[in-house]
Swiss-Prot record:
Domain of life of the organism encoding this protein: Bacteria
One Pfam entry name: Ribosomal_S11
Disulfide bridge map: none
Protein name stated in the entry: Small ribosomal subunit protein uS11
Subunit structure: Part of the 30S ribosomal subunit. Interacts with proteins S7 and S18. Binds to IF-3.
Gene source species: Prochlorococcus marinus (strain NATL2A)
One BP annotation, GO: translation
Function (record text): Located on the platform of the 30S subunit, it bridges several disparate RNA helices of the 16S rRNA. Forms part of the Shine-Dalgarno cleft in the 70S ribosome.
Encoding gene (name): rpsK
Keyword tags: Ribonucleoprotein, Ribosomal protein, RNA-binding, rRNA-binding
Length: 130
């Protein structure tokens, strides 16, 4: 039998990225936190679903806080110190995710709301009658 050399998978190298951008997408059902460098390369990401929450609990502020802490911990390992925060969406986890990033040890230099607003584009879904 021929011997085969064992090939290990390509592991992400540790980069020293001192400052970056945190994108927080907060919907009513989930919160996604992506941390990128200034050119847009994703360094770490996390979401409420990836943090172990399922169903309706993904939309809670605590789930957003947990997701932000996990993403921040991975970014700190890459050497990140200063961040700009771009928040998108109407969800309940916006403020708690920002607070969790601050508590994790990242210095926030800018917070910007980039929620897309239509200039009367598509028709809205009909109102729920409960």
């Amino acid at each position: 039998m021929a011997t085969t050399s064992k090939k290990s998978g390509s592991k992400k190298s540790k980069r020293n990225v001192p400052n970056g951008v945190v994108h927080i997408q907060s919907t009513f059902n989930n919160t996604i936190v992506s941390i990128t460098d200034t050119s847009g390369e994703v360094i770490s990401w996390s979401s409420a679903g990836a943090s172990g929450f399922k169903g309706a609990r993904k939309g809670t502020p605590f789930a957003a806080q947990t997701a932000a802490e996990l993403a921040a911990r991975r970014a700190l390992e890459q050497g990140m110190r200063q961040i700009e925060v771009l928040v998108r969406g109407p969800g309940s986890g916006r403020e708690t995710a920002i607070r969790a990033l601050q508590v994790a040890g990242l210095e926030i230099t800018l917070i910007r709301d980039v929620t897309p607003l239509p200039h009367n584009g598509c028709r809205r879904p009909k109102r729920r009658r409960v």
